[in-house]
Amino acid sequence: YMDVISLHQAGFTNTVAPLGTAFTPNQAMLLKRYTNEVILSFDSDGAGIKAALRALPILRQNGLRGRVLSMKPYKDPDELIKAEGAESYQKRIDEAESGRMFELLVLYGQYNQQDPESRTEFLHEVAKKLAQIEEPLERQIYLTSAANRFMIRKNDLENLVNRYGLGYQYEQVNEQYKTAPETEERRKEKKKNTKNQPQ
């Protein structure tokens, strides 16, 4: 409660909290009635980072843009506002990372960037994340940003993304095929395959 109270007292009245529970799709649907963008302001510790990582896909699935506010070196909004005031908090809102870039930066911190093998693994994970962005223009924008931020040639990263993208598209099509209603043609094909199996 204290974070929300502090933010409202500081003038940030469009602030809500999940009250200690995990952020849910129902909460995202409720937020969608009032806005298209949500700035996550969870605690800066490991639990807060995990909460943000869990919330971001839920926001996307419900048509909301998610950004993540950096609280460091403070633990939470209440502590930040008491130490630096409302202007500092507003500045951090303006500079909040996009959800996808936040996910990549969390990944960055999980790998030793000085070790060639570890850095290679990291870049492969970045490519996997980027390959999952369905909108081509959005994917290109993040590809350029990631290449600049993580100091890799854009062409090299793009080749990796394209490689993983083909696999991701295949998985999607395969999953859609599995879950699609069974047609007469599919029933015949399945029956034919069953007959051809060795006894």
Q: What are the roles of these predicted feature ranges?
A:
Residues 1-3:
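Short, polar loop motifs at secondary-structure junctions
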Residues 5-13, 34:
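Alpha-helix C-terminal capping segments
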Residues 22-38, 42-199:
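A charged alpha-helical hairpin associated with nucleic-acid processing machineries
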